[in-house]
Amino acid sequence: MTETHHAPLPDVYPSSKQPTSSTYSKCKKFGLPLIGLLTLLLAYISSFTKPVPNSTFDVPASPQCKKPQVYRPSFNKSVNLILNDKQFKIDSIRKLSGAIQIPTEISDTNPLPNDDPEYYSEFFKLHKYFEETFPLVHSHLKVEKVNQLGLLYTWEGTDPSLKPILFMAHQDVVPVNREIWDSWQYPPLSGHYDQETDYVWGRGSNDCKNLMLAELEGIEQLLADGYQTERTVILSLGFDEESSGFMGAKVLAPFLLERYGPDSMFSIIDEGAGLLRLDKNLYIAAAVNAEKGYVDVRISIHGHGGHSSVQPDHTTIGVASELIYMMENHPFDYNFSLDNPIYDVLQCAAEHSGFLPPHVREAILKAPVDEGKRKVLTEFAASHPDIRDLIRTTRAVDVINGGVKANALPGLTSFIVNHRVDIHSSVNETVENDLYWARVIAEKHGYGLTFHDEIIIPETKLGHISLASEKMLEPAPVSPTSGHVWEIFAGTVQNLFQNEILAEQKDADVYVTGGLFSGNTDTKYYWGLSKNIYRFVAGIFPFDQLRTIHSVNEHISASSHVSAVAFVYEYIVNVNEYGHD
């Protein structure tokens, strides 16, 4: 039976406070949709067609990037079936294809579910599809609807004293642009399976109906095998992640927090990176354990308008343009600390791959003990556009408005600056930097300056510049890549790929590291529930496949999809068998 809960909408983001006026009393100068580090590293490494000789630098005899201890579940009744049975794979493809054919598209602005249920009709169809496709899940698990559309599945364990495992995914997908529908190799809502390439095509195939179906199917198979979990297993499915999760995860997370309390989950698994094949034999699984922060700053130049035949030295558009020019030409400093998760990935690549130039490998491996090499490493990362933004705060002017008529001076020009906040910085530090440059321009041109309600420079006869921060999110807490919880997670990944999926590739080497997202997932609302949050989909994802997310020809390997099913199956069992709180 499904229960429905009408939960209130909480505040905008967790752990983000509106900056106070005292924060800004002194101004200081600080000198791709969701992008995972694996995609970025592959973009660089794939530019080399053959290994680079390493005669000028020897890899240390005792590598720091080591294979984790393998965790094998003793209950593995269906692992071989999931990975190798043709009929299971056909059925799994059919289930994923059916979900793709239900267009649960979400826009940037959406009505509340209670206000316009018809708007969400496809989501209700998806819920019905789940009931029909996963009958054991719906007969054995408690199913609750939070804010009408958020789905919460609870598989009660036999020992309520143990922390639950929490899996996440989202039901929604980004809209398909109807104007370029014909650009798709197969119709975007077809869920077409091409046996020759082993690809399932369609919107949501890789973001992230694949993960959602893998979680449901893994649990369904455990139930079919008669498995009884000792530890409670929870599946939380939002419905508006692609528009920041304001009505889905933002309501589901506090609902869980109220029920279970803070730090109540053993671990949280959500969408993220997978395995990257760096060369013929080397695979790196980068479970994203950190995300950058976020803040938009709305900047407005307030003038007095008038007829354009009586022009000032600079219109509000001109002042805004100069401020934008100053900000774009004074980017945030690079800050490559060795505790940045991307260093772990680079370290694995340097120790075990032959594709990096010797001087780069040396810089990576000697960075912990050599300040000069650390500088070389920073310069290397800063010189590659695909990597550099993971070691600094970014600033992009994305929206601008000003002027209404050719012969009328613009009384108001405003623009929005989007920032992705470095994991070693903060929202306050980021906004202070914008405020510094606004003050430079205000003083140069004789304008006043305000931040929210605080008057920094009184308004002048020309007008004033105003700043306001919006949608603030601090960088995510970095989840540990050591300790008991991580060891079970990494050991499950290691066993699944090293000993099962790649078992016939005798010289294959798999390593598991942390990773970093420059974007944000629904996990931003779940920080209070666990310190162990890993954003990971257990599949091998080629670079060309990842590039299709949110784009034309989104697709996924069916083999990668069933490997994700196997991971869910094994991970639940392993945490039950080896986990302790």
UniProtKB/Swiss-Prot annotation:
Extracellular side, ranges: 47-581
Transmembrane segments: 30-46
Record keyword Hydrolase present: yes
EC id: 3.4.17.-
Source taxon at top rank: Eukaryota
InterPro entries: ArgE/DapE_CS, Bact_exopeptidase_dim_dom, Pept_M20_carboxypep, Pept_M20A, Peptidase_M20, Peptidase_M20_dimer
Lipid bilayer topology: Single-pass type II membrane protein
Cofactor: Zn(2+)
UniProt keyword terms in alphabetical order: Carboxypeptidase, Glycoprotein, Hydrolase, Isopeptide bond, Membrane, Metal-binding, Protease, Signal-anchor, Transmembrane, Transmembrane helix, Ubl conjugation, Zinc
Active site, UniProt feature: D172, E241
Linked residues for Glycyl lysine isopeptide (Lys-Gly) (interchain with G-Cter in ubiquitin): K17
Subcellular location: Membrane
Biological process terms in GO annotation: proteolysis
Predominant location: membrane
Residues carrying sugar: N54, N76, N335, N428
An example Gene Ontology molecular-function term: metallocarboxypeptidase activity
Similarity remark: Belongs to the peptidase M20A family.
Annotated protein name in UniProt: Putative carboxypeptidase YOL153C
